[in-house]
Structure formats: structure tokens, C-alpha cells
């Protein structure tokens, strides 16, 4: 199996990104293929790539060849019934899809399905993930920098940290911290 690391461009999923992405894909299936995804989403180009990645990794969007982007069945339901992802159940659905997606979110898959530890350091997690992912990597070397970036993003998505001098314009808070994982 090919593993996927760092598709998120080192951006943890932020508050508002899923609903913004769902709305833009629903309105225009070519939003990511016409090279104006960043403008349409009102973010930088790497953030637009990250939003695209998160929508696909969480199985809220797919990109069939020659069709552009389209919402999956669950993406359509979430967009229709909980457009702003205010219901924690919508976040749980996304989390379950992400944690089960070994193809696009390999580190999340390994962390939530192959590892059973309560306490760890980043270095511990790095070593454990290397051990778990090496057999999945089909004899290819695992780029340690990419794995470190995945670990940082994964932890930033689920850990609720108190931020000093919080600036709402930065909006780096991930909605998944409220899952309490």
C-alpha cells in the first residue's frame, strides 16, 4: 500500500474550513481545478490545497476523473443538514472517516487504529509510527520530516491549548479539539 503523508501542507484543519470548502465545491465543481481555489476560498494557495486535502481525506468530497470536485453522499448530507458543522456529530463523522482512511490519511489511520497508548512524547510517537508505517510503505523509506509534520498537525487538531493573546483573525483553533480525544 502506498502511504500518504503531509497532504495537509502542514495546516491543521481549522474552524470554518470544512463548511467553506463544502459550499464552494457545491457551487462549482471546478473550484480546485481552475487554479482559483485560493481566491474562491479566500485563503492562500497552500491553505486551499490543505482544504482540498481535508475534504478528500475526510471523505466529504471526491474528485472523479474529468468531473472536477463533488460532494460525497455524506458530504451532501452534512452540507444540507449541518452547513456550519455546529453539531458535534458531524465532526465525529469526519473524524471517523479521516481515522479510517489509510490511503489519504495514513498517520491518522495508524494513530487511531494501530496504536494503543495513553501517554507519549512526540519522539515516542515518531518511533511508534515509524514502526507501524514501515510495513505499509512497500519497502520505501518514510520521510521523517513529513512524518514529523504529520505528528504536529495531528496533535494540533485534537489538543486544546490555551492561547495567550488570542487573535480571532488567525483562527488556528481546530474544531476537533472539542471531541476530547
Label the predicted regions:
Residues 1-181:
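Donor-sugar nucleotide-binding helix/loop cap in glycosyltransferases
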Amino acid at each position: 500500500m502506498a502511504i500518504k503523508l503531509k497532504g495537509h501542507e502542514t495546516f491543521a484543519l481549522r474552524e470554518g474550513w470544512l463548511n467553506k470548502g463544502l459550499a464552494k465545491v457545491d457551487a462549482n465543481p471546478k473550484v480546485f481545478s481552475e487554479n482559483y481555489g485560493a481566491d474562491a476560498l479566500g485563503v492562500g494557495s497552500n491553505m486551499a490545497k490543505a482544504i482540498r486535502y481535508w475534504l478528500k481525506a475526510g471523505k466529504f468530497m471526491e474528485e472523479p476523473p474529468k468531473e472536477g470536485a463533488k460532494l460525497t453522499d455524506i458530504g451532501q448530507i452534512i452540507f444540507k443538514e449541518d452547513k456550519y458543522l455546529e453539531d458535534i456529530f458531524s465532526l465525529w463523522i469526519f473524524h471517523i472517516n479521516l481515522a479510517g482512511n489509510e490511503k489519504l490519511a495514513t498517520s491518522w489511520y495508524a494513530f487511531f487504529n494501530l496504536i494503543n497508548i495513553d501517554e507519549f512524547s512526540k519522539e515516542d510517537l515518531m518511533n511508534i509510527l515509524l514502526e507501524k508505517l514501515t510495513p505499509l510503505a512497500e519497502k520505501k523509506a518514510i520521510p521523517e520530516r513529513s512524518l514529523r509534520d504529520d505528528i504536529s498537525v495531528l496533535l494540533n487538531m485534537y489538543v486544546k491549548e490555551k492561547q495567550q493573546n488570542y487573535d480571532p483573525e488567525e483562527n488556528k483553533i481546530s474544531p476537533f479539539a472539542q471531541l476530547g480525544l
